[in-house]
Amino acid sequence: MELGGHWDMNSAPRLVSETAERKQEQKTGTEAEAADSGAVGARRFLLCLYLVGFLDLFGVSMVVPLLSLHVKSLGASPTVAGIVGSSYGILQLFSSTLVGCWSDVVGRRSSLLACILLSALGYLLLGAATNVFLFVLARVPAGIFKHTLSISRALLSDVVPEKERPLVIGHFNTASGVGFILGPVVGGYLTELEDGFYLTAFICFLVFILNAGLVWFFPWREAKPGSTEKGLPLRKTHVLLGRSHDTVQEAATSRRARASKKTAQPWVEVVLALRNMKNLLFSEMWDIFLVRLLMAMAVMLYYSNFVLALEERFGVRPKVTGYLISYSSMLGAVAGLALGPILRLYKHNSQALLLHSSILTCTLLLLYSLAPTMGAVVLSSTLLSFSTAIGRTCITDLQLTVGGAQASGTLIGVGQSVTAVGRIIAPLLSGVAQEVSPCGPPSLGAVLALVAIFIMSLNKRHSSGDGNSKLKSE
């Protein structure tokens, strides 16, 4: 810069300063664009995962309501049909934990794809089953590998911060619940057609193949070896709900497993999975799993004789009861959307929210048992839809908070196994309680919920999420 033909020496620092400011502005703008791009990518990833949950339950719920009718049409007696139905639950009982451990070892992407494809094979075989033996054989792949939702929840726990986790899992449950509402409608329509069950099973197979394709084309990020913790490759410029996008792909593989992955043999991976399971089972989380079992059984007892009880107590036809069940299912799906404001009200204290939702569930089960009119039944069913949906999300979040993210697949797998135990025990308890009264099963459910509340009141150490469990330190 010249003034009267002479260089103004004061302009040099000013010029340097202006240049530095422009560079800083450009850098800030670039970082802001990268952050915005990362936020968009994060939302897209979560929406894809929600769609996976929706398609999974949509496909399954098309077929499952028709299974008992179809196996009967194949010539099975009621006893054989009951054994066939129980076999799926038994397979789930033993496979849930193992598949969860396996997903911690090999990564979420591989395990999720394998589970979806092998489940699809099971439903394809189901559509080809022409006798009871083939029907039972077709249920084996799904019984062992139908853990899409569990692995998806584990993946969600890997990629979102702790405070956002209950909200995101609630939204995932909502998306899955919508699929469970729509699936039976489509399946019921298709089964009216000629060879309707076989057509429905084949369409379910196609839905699972579509789901596998969706997972394959997920916005997974390629990463350099060792660039991530827990095997989640990322780009540092991306952010997922406040956490680095380093945690998006192949979640929850520990550093040791990741480092040795190239040389690890399958039996080594199995040993790692079993060791994780042993650490979990002997951890200090017994009370959380016991609460999960008791609350799951309480709700199962409520639903176990719902149709029969309303018919005996109030003369309600099964068709009307079906409408009430669909209404409750829709409310349960909506409850996931209400988790955000509720969590903010509780300052993200999942244990307090779980305790209060369990108290509400216990009270409503008792109200339903003593309901003098259908109005009281509808009221209790409405509120139960909210309390049980919130409780399921909170107990899952509490497991993950206490157990630590490194074993999220194992944690969710063990939780599913605990629920499977409830599915085996609840029908037996329901049958005994129903011998006394149609109100017996829900009354027993209220008692079990009360025991769970008592256990939660005695064990409040988990509320801080300090990670005292043994898994946290692994």
Swiss-Prot record:
Membrane topology term: Multi-pass membrane protein
Residue spans of biased composition, Basic and acidic residues class: 19-30
MF terms in GO: transmembrane transporter activity
Major location category of this protein: membrane
Gene3D superfamilies for the chain: MFS general substrate transporter like domains
Location in or out of the cell: Membrane
UniProt GO cellular component terms: membrane
One family name in Pfam for this protein: MFS_1
Identification of the protein by name: Major facilitator superfamily domain-containing protein 9
PANTHER family xrefs: MAJOR FACILITATOR SUPERFAMILY DOMAIN-CONTAINING PROTEIN 10 (PTHR23504), MAJOR FACILITATOR SUPERFAMILY DOMAIN-CONTAINING PROTEIN 9 (PTHR23504:SF14)
Spans annotated as Disordered: 1-33
Family assignment from sequence similarity: Belongs to the major facilitator superfamily.
Keyword Transport: yes
Keywords recorded for this protein, A-Z: Membrane, Transmembrane, Transmembrane helix, Transport
Matches recorded under InterPro entries: MFS, MFS_dom, MFS_trans_sf, Sugar_transporter_CS, Tet-R_TetA/multi-R_MdtG-like
Residues annotated as transmembrane: 45-65, 80-100, 116-136, 167-187, 197-217, 288-308, 323-343, 359-379, 436-456
